[in-house]
């Protein structure tokens, strides 16, 4: 199959091999003309083979080029989709919720309720306050509302008030329990330590007893307790001495018998009556009626009960009847008729000049024992004014009379005092002008 003068057939295989240079030349060369088909056979075969190889190469190259854009498009599309999904994730992660306020839900609710003038809010009003105050509660997250309701209903420091008649709306008012005032520190809404509440619960009875006894809460005290009067006030049943100037004397008892810090009692064998210094720091006792006896008659005596008058040896207040209307102090426990039963008797005690403390030790001892100081802890830390208010133990006792015995202290106008032990608590009348009253723990 060899032709004379023709080239060997080996170059035909070499021409069909896809050489990059030949492929480029075939793509750039114009197509063969139709007149070249009448040429010699070897040339024709070689040209046809070359053209076929060129067409094969061109078809393969075109297919490759067509497949390349499709692959490029696919890769570009996939990359775009991946970039789009990554951008969506980044965009969603960039919209983070605002940070929660650094307070517990209890503190937030307390903050909302205390911002109200009436100190009470409905649930929707609490929501509105929190949304207006903190950006955390304005987002799409609504789980905080469940937390608010949970804390309102399960914490005992919040009280649900009954709905008032005629009030529009369906929500109940919520307020703070007054007993939970120690839950938060003053000036902030941070919780106190865990054991602080139990300590406050343990100290609460003592706190109320002290407040009610010392007169810090006027609504907790009986009507007989009187507060301290200003220095410009008229003379009355007030004691400005002792315990920081707080008035702790009930209006039915002699403040002069309390022996303020300005008084200087002399505790000798002569039993002198304590003399009170006439300085403005201590006021003096005027006519102060106390609860009357069974017959409507008050007791008489320098500290035993009844109308307590200023003694001539212990008070510079004159004993003139003209001063009766000016310095008389009425007690709510008595009526105006609970005075001396004798019409001619003066409502003020005046010690006769003949009766001196050294000449009559019995009378002066009775006066002195009644003028001894009251015990604050025994007398005025009790709520019951009639039952538990008692004259306490004196600081200096001059007699060995038992405190538990019930004595009827009788004092007539002549200054002679006598003691009648009574088992039935009856009342003795010494003369026309002497009256008495049962003194429960009478200390002499």
From Swiss-Prot:
User: Low complexity compositional bias: what residue ranges?
Assistant: 34-75, 309-323
Q: What Pfam families would the database entry show?
A: Forkhead (PF00250)
Biased composition annotated in UniProt, kind: Gly residues: 76-87, 293-308
Q: Which segment of the chain is annotated as a signal peptide? A: none
Subcellular location field:
Nucleus
Task: Summarize which parts of the chain are annotated to bind DNA, as ranges.
Answer: 99-190
Expression across tissues is: Lung and placenta. Predominantly expressed in gastrointestinal tract including stomach.
Please list the GO biological process terms of this entry: animal organ morphogenesis; embryonic camera-type eye morphogenesis; embryonic digestive tract development; epithelial to mesenchymal transition; establishment of planar polarity of embryonic epithelium; extracellular matrix organization; genitalia development; negative regulation of DNA-templated transcription
Quaternary state and interactors: Interacts with the transcription factors TBP and TFIIB.
Q: What is this protein called?
A: Forkhead box protein F2
* Organism of derivation: Homo sapiens
**Encoding gene per record:** FOXF2
């Amino acid at each position: 199959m060899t032709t004379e003068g023709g080239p060997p057939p080996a170059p035909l295989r070499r021409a069909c091999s896809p050489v990059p240079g030949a492929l480029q030349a075939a793509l750039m060369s114009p197509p063969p003309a139709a007149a070249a088909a009448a040429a010699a056979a070897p040339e024709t075969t070689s040209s046809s083979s070359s053209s076929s190889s060129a067409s094969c190469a061109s078809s393969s190259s075109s297919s490759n080029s067509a497949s390349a854009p499709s692959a490029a498009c696919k890769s570009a599309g996939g990359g775009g989709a991946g970039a789009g999904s990554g951008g969506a994730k980044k965009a969603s992660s960039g919209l983070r919720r605002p940070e929660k306020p650094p307070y517990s839900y209890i503190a937030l609710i307390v903050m909302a309720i205390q911002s109200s003038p009436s100190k009470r809010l409905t649930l929707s009003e609490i929501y509105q306050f929190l949304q207006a105050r903190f950006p955390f509660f304005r987002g799409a997250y609504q789980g905080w509302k469940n937390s608010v309701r949970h804390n309102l209903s399960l914490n005992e420091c919040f009280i649900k008030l009954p709905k008032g008649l005629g009030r529009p709306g369906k929500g109940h008012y919520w307020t703070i329990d007054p007993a939970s005032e120690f839950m938060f520190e003053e000036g902030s809404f941070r919780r106190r330590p865990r054991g602080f509440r139990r300590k406050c619960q343990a100290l609460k009875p003592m706190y109320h007893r002290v407040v009610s006894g010392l007169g810090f809460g006027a609504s907790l005290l009986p009507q007989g307790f009187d507060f301290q009067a200003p220095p410009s006030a008229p003379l009355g049943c007030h004691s400005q001495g002792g315990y920081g100037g707080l008035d702790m004397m009930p209006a039915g008892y002699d403040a002069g018998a309390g022996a303020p810090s300005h008084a200087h009692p002399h505790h000798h064998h002569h039993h002198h009556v304590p003399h009170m210094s006439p300085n403005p720091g201590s006021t003096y006792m005027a006519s102060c009626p106390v609860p009357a006896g069974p017959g409507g008659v008050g007791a008489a005596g320098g500290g035993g009960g009844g109308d307590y008058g200023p003694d001539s040896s212990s008070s510079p207040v004159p004993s003139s009847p003209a001063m009766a209307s000016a310095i008389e102090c009425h007690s709510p426990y008595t009526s105006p008729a609970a005075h001396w039963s004798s019409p001619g008797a003066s409502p003020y005690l005046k010690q006769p000049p003949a009766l001196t403390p050294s000449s009559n030790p019995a009378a002066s001892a009775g006066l002195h024992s009644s003028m001894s100081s009251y015990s604050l802890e025994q007398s005025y830390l009790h709520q019951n004014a009639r039952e538990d208010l008692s004259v306490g133990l004196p600081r200096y006792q001059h007699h060995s009379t038992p405190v538990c015995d019930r004595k009827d202290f009788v004092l007539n106008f002549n200054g002679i005092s006598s003691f009648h032990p009574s088992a039935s608590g009856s009342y003795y009348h010494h003369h026309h002008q002497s009256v008495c009253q049962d003194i429960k723990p009478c200390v002499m």
